[in-house]
Amino acid sequence: MFPGIPVTTNLPVNVSTGTNAGHLFYVNYTPVNSFAIEYEDSAKFMGPDVKKSPQEFLQKTENLSIPEGPAKIVFEQESTFDGYPAREFEYAVGGKGNYSVRYKMILAGGRFYVLYVIFLTANPHPADRAIFFNSLSLN
């Protein structure tokens, strides 16, 4: 449930990583609030290392998602979503930007979902974020 009509874009196919398809849907609700979901299909998400420890894969992906510099992790949690491994985390960027990003990552077989919301740290709109994150349905 996006707070508006999402823009859709296809991400380029990356042969070197085995990514077959990527899709991004996003809404810039206001100049300082954005909602997005991205997913990729790839055989690498079914690989033995990922299957052996999906939460380790999600933790490594979290580490790669956080920008260097003033970003600070303010929340992180392992979880599941419809029985699939999931992880949620949030980081805040101080300084002039003073924004935060909340992520929810889900590893569902050969598909990797990333939902995220970008917002002003001082104005997080947790109810809107919860509605957006909880509206995802895996069919």
Residue ranges of predicted features:
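Generic preference for well-ordered secondary structure
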Residues: 45, 73-75, 99, 113-116, ...
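Coil-to-beta-strand transition motifs
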Residues: 32-34, 84, 98, 107-115
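A short, polar/proline- and glycine-enriched secondary-structure boundary/capping micro-motif
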Residues: 13, 20-21, 46-51, 76, ...
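Signature of long, low-cysteine stretches enriched in small and polar/charged residues
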Residues: 4-26, 59-106
